[in-house]
């Protein structure tokens, strides 16, 4: 995944500490594990640890819980010890440049080079199985905590989209009452969207889901979020990071009717199962960067961006209107990376019957840390009803007024 984060839920003190890895490493949307946070902050004890994926069979072909991924993390740590990046752009080095840096480090940072090739060798020997994947990740997580004298009793694994939905409800004003919770992202555990109906904080059910079917190569998954990623890439921007620029530029354009119609014809909403599906033959061109760039050149940047933004708005509005027909509940919780699209949220408010909408502030994968922590607390029988009293979404560092004043006085 991306946007790794840590959330420490103290059910005795009724406190929350949460932080994204990028806040420590300064690598935007950092996909490394949470060890940079653990090394920077002191934690007295950790009873349980949870992870926000549980597809050990890799049915969704996202590779998140394959044993080889644990070695990929070790390889990444070794590379960073060699490159010493300050920002994410520093990681964009060519293969030849990387090899030169590795060779140079043979004489200046041999331990990092040894760790790099050691992890690559071990990765090559892996023979993956669902049981092996689970054990490998459990060991990887425990070993990383043990390095900092933290010894969790157990490691839990929860479904990706449930980890999005749970905090969007528990941290919302609707906690304890009825609400629908929609998750929408690129993909996770084989799906790009799920819809839950909450009756209360102890009773909820899955009422709709949309699968992110793998299209056979690279990062091509059938998904609204992934399509938006491809438009971002066609604009020569960074996918999973610069989508907000597409959303902003779209406001100055007008969607090309033909291309928008082509997108919509490839998209099918089943109002009975509450799922969003695709005609593979019709949607495939939208995963071709050359195809998209040709249309970008033809209609201009603003209108090109307006196509995918309008498509997103109309598709989600139509989907939620069908959902409301079956489940007429006026409260809606939104989470998942696509929920960062504020104009989509505005359209939901203006064009559906949902009157009260809550968007989880850490709507992306960083919010999964909070969701998995809440699910763990519930599983071990802890009370988390106090979470509804948290009205501010800031769970990181705290500073006193005196500390703030002292810093300001320095300027």
Residue locations for each model-derived region?
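Short acidic/glycine-rich loops and adjacent helix/strand connectors
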Residues: 1-411
